[in-house]
Amino acid sequence: MDSIVTTEDTIAAIASAISIGKGGVAIIRVSGKDAINSCKKIVQTKSKYAWESHRVFRGFIQENKQNKFIDEVLILVMKSPNSFTGEDVVELHCHGGIIIVNKVLKILLSNNSRVRLANPGEFSQRAFLNGKIDLTQAESINQLINASNARSAELAFSGVQGEIKKKIDDIKNDLINQLCEIEARVDFEEDFTDFDYTKYLKNIKKVKEKIELLIENAKRNSYIHNGISIALIGKTNVGKSSLLNLLAKKEKAIVTNIPGTTRDVIEVNLTINDIPMKIIDTAGIRETHEQIESIGIKKSFGKIKESDFIIYIYSLEEGFNEEDKKIIQEIPKEKLITILGNKKDLIDCKNINSNELKHTILMSIKNNDGERLLIDTIIKKCGLKQVENINIFLNDRHLTNLSACLSNLNDTDEIIENKLPFDLLSIELRDGIQNLSKITGQELTEELLDNIFSKFCIGK
């Protein structure tokens, strides 16, 4: 994206979805000081409300000076500062379809040398630069547009309403209060009694708990928006493909009694309990000299690294043996994992070793016995059991800055513990406040802002 825009430019773009190609209405948005005049050049209207702010009126798009009309439109005018961008904004509501809306946009641009096509996210960027929204609200708008499920949309909308900023400002105000007390002591030390380190540490602990809760929620709501990738891992013929078919409610993978039937990765996207999940069926892991099967097994280990969650499946008929233990040792310790003992219908569960039962979900995939328990276990281990308590969506940028702030606060603990110079507390608190300010967009470079908004769609 180009460098930060100036209000000398007037920008235009299609603001409605056109990927399907057809629709009842398509919208062109125009923003800038020439927005109204540029639209007047291509619109003919007899409405008495024409070009008044916050009025909708009817008009016709004129292709040339011979009064050839190509579409009948509704025009909505929003004059500065009472618009999304804070500038003069005009919206042309055309008939839907790629052909007509592209033609209207082309006529608008060709008749106005001071109007150019908007860059991705440029309308939202102008709204941010003009103080109409903070950066978290702008990002939440983009998140809302790209929401993959209803719960993700709810979280994004809370950000649009300013809920992220409220939480960040609350933490920031706590730190500002601590900073004021410390800097007053540094500047006017003779006017203060001994500093109450215990009280300070208690206050900072409360702030850290707020940040840690936000960070923990950020990891959970990433699952809500992006989904949980779940790899089905195990030896051959333990029921991985059967479990994939059960969860998908249709036959996605071939199931036979022949070991090594699944030789490649099969992925299925599902939504379970309003949470998107990608179930990945992998080749059974075993010693083999068959080249194609070996490639599939290598891919299985690759999917272990890529996935958020591992379901390790073994056969209760065979029991959990040394070969299973060896495979599980290859799974990184930080991975979320649950162990599933399949084929419970073929054995007497009373004969299973009690230590084995402690960490195993018993299931008969063939008889659909245990599916609910498996799903509940996945949701619980991913921290999504109380998903209704997660009320904002935090992205990776927010998480990075929150983690940096938490690191600053941990450093203040070390300063006190090691009896380092008192003014170092002030430095760390200032850095922590600055990291929080970056979240809402108060401490960001132009280059970083450009990068953030370039990920938005063109009409937003």
From Swiss-Prot:
Residues annotated as domain TrmE-type G? 227-383
Keywords associated with the record: Cytoplasm, GTP-binding, Hydrolase, Magnesium, Metal-binding, Nucleotide-binding, Potassium, tRNA processing
Question: What cofactor does this protein call for?
Answer: K(+)
Q: What is this protein called?
A: tRNA modification GTPase MnmE
What organism does the UniProt record list as the source?
Answer: Prochlorococcus marinus (strain AS9601)
Which superkingdom, per the lineage? Bacteria
GO MF entry, a single one:
GTP binding
Residues reported in the UniProt entry to bind (6S)-5-formyl-5,6,7,8-tetrahydrofolate: R29, E91, K132, K460
Q: Which Pfam families match?
A: MMR_HSR1, MnmE_helical, TrmE_N
The record's family statement is: Belongs to the TRAFAC class TrmE-Era-EngA-EngB-Septin-like GTPase superfamily. TrmE GTPase family.
Which gene underlies this protein?
Answer: mnmE
Which residues are listed for Mg(2+) binding in this entry?
A: S241, T262
The record's InterPro entries line, in alphabetical order, gives: G_TrmE (IPR031168), GTP-bd (IPR006073), GTP-bd_TrmE_N (IPR018948), GTPase_MnmE (IPR004520), MnmE_dom2 (IPR027368), MnmE_helical (IPR025867), P-loop_NTPase (IPR027417), Small_GTP-bd (IPR005225)
Q: Where in the cell is it found?
A: Cytoplasm
Q: Does the keyword Magnesium apply?
A: yes
